[in-house]
């Protein structure tokens, strides 16, 4: 839906393009801004040569998204995440000579997450990064993270919601202590932290001499 990020309501598939374009964006705290909803092409044009971009749910529209990234020359900046089997992703990427980055999402405490992680390991596939999700930091989670880093991939942690990071979320970093959140994530081996509070995270990383 467009509920979380704009002042509009409803599912994208039920709303016309013109209606969506009239919506304005909201801040992370739900406050309306004066910024109109951009198209993917407009957003990527602003990001070109500046930052990496994660297109959420982008795999479902890979062909359309890739056509735009190739047109703008930003394909190497764009990341797609998902939970699909290795061969499914490989087959899709084989259709093109130039692809966006792809990162598997591993819900390591769920059977399907463990199976996907084991599949990557058994096939000898080393993605650029894994997003590991967990709601309770168990020995199994710790072992998975260690294996990710030891295998040559980066460890991506999503700190947006408690259920994705065992309670080590942005809100806790803001209301309690950045060190208790971001410090612990770094100690776990995380080298990529997805955040809704970039200023807070950047200040912490710079203070620790950990920003690259």
Annotate the PLM regions.
Residues 1-109, 132-135, 149-151:
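Metal-dependent phosphodiesterase/phospholipase catalytic core, i.e.
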Residues 30-32, 111-212:
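C-terminal active-site rim and adjoining tail of enzyme catalytic domains
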